[in-house]
Amino acid sequence: MQIHVYDHAQQVGQAAATLLAAQLISKPNSVLGLATGSTPIPTYHALISLYKAGVVDFSSASSFNLDEYVGLPAGHPCSYHSFMREQLFDHVNMPADHIHIPDGNAADPQTECARYDQAITAAGGIDMQVLGIGRNGHIGFNEPDDHFTCGCHVVNLTESTIQANRRFFDSEASVPRQAVSLGVGSILASRCILLLATGEDKAQAIHDTICGDITSRTPASILKTHPNVILLLDRAAAGML
């Protein structure tokens, strides 16, 4: 693991955007793995600035998002489809048919999981995967559990994750209880992984990921088995190292 610590979240975002831009410049048809949540927003805004400056071009690239809530249609304002359009895709030139996000409203979520894994394989795999990390150490929606799940799967969200996502919804009752998520095997198949963490509320998870044992109770700890992982942290998230 490479570990880089920055003064604040905006610098983390700029550093991640610089690495993603370098990937796109070296391989214009790169397959990017993208994440949602508040942590990668500065990264996406920095990428938009690089695109507007003519530094980076998305026209040949494609993307696969990590996850989507079960039961939310793509047009729902709290769906990850909506999030990605607002934070990135509406502002750059990635073709719509190159953008892939799980269908959380699919009639059969299990079939959707198999389809999504097959689509990633058909695209040649993910070149650079962006990850955030949950307070409980989850990556994607791979929650602490008694085992690691390899492929795309349906996840029952933990109470801590439901509470963390409560702020995005009108009420706690409206927060989805399940999600479709890439599994750790799908994530580890990426050729390069960028793990972003900002804020002191992520410090314990980062400590456990880096300093603790590899365990499914801290899902991000499995990243220590990958040969090309770059951690981009602000000082608050690195505070327990």
Task: Name each model feature, range by range.
Residues 1-32, 237:
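N-terminal glycine-/serine-/threonine-rich phosphate-binding loop
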Residues 26-52:
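Glycine-rich N-terminal segment of FAD-binding domains in flavoprotein oxidoreductases
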Residues 34-39, 131-135, 198:
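Glycine-rich beta-strand-to-loop/alpha-helix junction loops that act as flexible
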Residues 46-57, 80-82, 144-153, 212-214:
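A glycine- and small-aliphatic-rich helix-loop capping segment at beta-alpha/alpha-beta transitions
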Residues 56-128:
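Ligand-binding beta-strand-loop-alpha-helix segment within the catalytic cores
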Residues 124-149:
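Glycine-rich phosphate-binding loop
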Residues 140-184:
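Class I SAM-dependent methyltransferase SAM-binding "motif I" and its flanking Rossmann-like core
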Residues 185, 189-241:
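ATP/nucleoside-binding phosphotransfer catalytic cores, i.e., glycine-rich phosphate-binding loops
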